[in-house]
Amino acid sequence: MKKNMSFKIIATVGLWAAIGLTACKAPQLSPDGERAVLPEGDGHTYDTAFVKPLEWNVFFQDSILQGYVEVALQNNYSFKQSMERVTMSRANLQRAKGLLLPEVGLGIGTSVNRFGEYTMDGVGNSETNVPSLAKDKHIPDPYRDFGLFLNFQWEADIWGKLTRKKQAAVARWMASVEATRFAQSVLISELAVHYYELIGLDKRRDVLEEAHISSKRSYELTRQLKKEGAETQLAVDQFHARMLLIESKLLENDQLIGEKERAIACLLGVFPFEIRRMSFEELRQIPFPLSDGVPANMLTLRPDVRAAEMELLASKADVMAAKAAFYPSLVLGAGGGFNSFDLGKWFTAPASQRIALSQYHETALKAYTEVLDLYCAGLNQVERVRLKEVETVAHQRSVTNANELFKLNYVGFLEVLSANERYLDSELERIDIITDLCRKKILLYRALGGGC
């Protein structure tokens, strides 16, 4: 009777405690998780028909580069690591889904006890095993105990806490997927930039070799004219110095070519090898099928913006789960009752949400600025290419005229040197501008989602 009274008192106190906790009200959190508001326009006219990102194998129409991209997606170590992070997030998602399901446990146990002869249990057992007691009721010595246990437990999601945890896990898994897509976009664009810069270096080498042949021819001509008394040693030395300068630039260019080839091999996850590539003239003919869209609308395609948005959704779900954790949990099992509430992330979740919101707005702002900068730079670069090509043609014509006039002794060697230097500088700059234009198109493609 005493035991029953004690149980009733404990149960009554526990019930009133549960009722009291149920009457508590969790503090309200301000729903400040709006999406970032971006400008409607920037003064330019865009083609708003482009609403989906191009796949990488459509944007990059060079079959050689496409083959390298496929190898990189299979072998690149950094990309493999990002894929493993997705696997980890998927495992956490499965765990969060399991929280909504009942837990069933099965246990098997066995033990052997031998009681000492002069202990309380040993003496008690010897007195219990009297001859008048049936044999099957005797306590064996040693005493063997076998057990089979089955238990059941299920936490009812009455406040939505477990559902919110599942939503947070789903959002974080989606964020990890977006992070992997971003890693793929970065990998492909970085590989393409190195590839096109390598093609530009090939063209620079061709131009430098042509300039070296021309400077050597001029050097030999001035030496011959000096022997005839028509030129001075100063002219010979100037042309000789120019020839040596171009040889030095050729060595530097070859070094850069080797570095680019090794960088590409590293992105492919293989040891260095000779990289096959198209010619510079073929590169000029390949289109980059990227329509121009409103940056504010296109930002939704960026994996980093989508990942930040998923993190924001996850943090909001964490806040709701923390609010639900403020209330007691109802756990159904072998017996019914209320567990004490778990404060858990109650104090940290709101701050985490504000951090995620701030990071989301920061990511969106940086993304918008990056897209606009690249778009404007691309427009300017196209005009620079046009002007530089006209300038290069004019310098090339000047070189031809200067050489002819020098042979006729109408101009001195300084005019010839000056014309050749201006043409070489203009041609090298033209190659750099075209290569940089390709790089900006690739970066703009990545900034608008990168085909993910």
Regions found by a protein language model. Give the residues of each.
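Periplasmic alpha-helical coiled-coil/stalk elements that build and connect Gram-negative outer-membrane
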Residues: 25, 171, 178-294, 401, ...
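C-terminal structural cap/anchor segments
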Residues: 349-387
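Membrane-embedded segments
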Residues: 84, 88-91
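Small/polar (Gly/Ser/Thr/Ala-rich) solvent-exposed segments
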Residues: 80, 103-123, 133-142, 147, ...
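Short segments within alpha-helical structural elements
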Residues: 216-220, 245-273, 322, 390-448
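Transmembrane beta-barrel architecture of outer-membrane proteins
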Residues: 65-67, 88, 145-147, 193, ...
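Terminal intrinsically disordered/low-complexity segments used for targeting and assembly
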Residues: 1-74, 254-300, 446-452
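Amphipathic alpha-helical coiled-coil scaffold segments and their short linker/junction regions
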Residues: 49-50, 58, 65, 69, ...
